[in-house]
Amino acid sequence: MTTLRLATGATASRILGVGSFQPERIVTNDELSQKMDTTDQWIRERVGIQERRFAAPDERLVDMAVIAGSKALADCGLSPSDVDTVILANCTMPTPIPNGAAQVADRIGIKAAGAFDLNAACAGFCYALATASDLVRSGSARRVLVIGAEKLTDWVDPVDRSNAIIFADGAGAAVVGPADEPGIGPVVWGSAGDLVETIGMTDRRFIYQEGQSVFRWATTAIAPIALRALEASGLQPADIDVLIPHQANLRIIEAIAKRLRAKGAREDMVVADDIVLSGNTSSASIPMAMDHMRGAGRIKPGDVALLIGFGAGLSYAGQVVICP
């Protein structure tokens, strides 16, 4: 009988560094109100967004991913040769083939990389982070560059008030590598396929969503999933220093934080609100928020952060990480 050799991986994994990128163009609520029936007050009250970034017509998803990924490598002092795998979480590549990850790896200089795209919509970064962690711990990869990048403006009707005010463009990245102590907890993930029709694409290839249905689901289902992620890591709500949910809607974020505090999370728990100035960037929103919060001094190395992604599918994923 032939016996196969198994790879031997690291005892644990952690996030080594993070980076992000946003396009230069800032789009305010007042600018949008000139194109559709809306106002700055209406947008702020319903979704909490003040401004967002739109990519230029010639600025591609892959371009943004390359910059964010390069910044994440620089953040932890690694060179492209130190990484052997690239995962690109996204749901807005202009074509299904070729995959974006291989292009990103080549442009950054990560030669002969294992490279693949992962589509779990707004939950994509958490799915990709869990996959990267398992690759490192199984021995299938040494270090993994995980990127969430989206050019949502290519897929949004510019005069659709329900969506054009929300979605934006950008990229966020993290480098995952070996660790002596766990820095990325077990993932809790799943889906609600019976709600698949609540977010999708129109015949014109524009994003649509049943906003009220998504809001009800997110404000009731996500906090219990977050609690399960804490339990999987052996932690209590009071152990959370930072809550970084997908930046879908400020009202959803506030509802999740309120429910976690009702279960024992601290009043001084820092809650990501990057959506206010960045909009909803789908799979990019969590790593982008982490990078922005760290740069602003709102989180520090060693903080315990609860990540929770959720979106089209409907899909969700959450895990606890130690901030780099």
Give the location of each predicted region.
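Glycine/charged-rich beta-loop-alpha catalytic/anionic-binding loops adjacent to active sites
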Residues: 49-51, 82-87, 106-119, 155-159, ...
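Flexible, glycine-rich active-site loops centered on histidine and acidic residues
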Residues: 135-168
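Short, well-ordered amphipathic alpha-helical segments that serve as non-catalytic structural scaffolds
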Residues: 38-39, 61-76, 217-233, 286-293
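Claisen-condensing/thiolase-fold acyl-transfer catalytic domains that form or cleave C-C bonds
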Residues: 3, 62, 66-69, 73, ...
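Short glycine-rich phosphate-binding loop at a beta-alpha junction
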Residues: 81-89, 237-246
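Short beta-strand segments
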Residues: 16-19, 89, 119, 144-150, ...
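Buried hydrophobic positions in well-ordered alpha/beta secondary-structure cores of metabolic enzymes
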Residues: 15-17, 43, 72, 83-86, ...
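Condensing-enzyme catalytic core mediating Claisen C-C bond formation in acyl metabolism
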Residues: 1-57, 159-220, 224-228, 310, ...
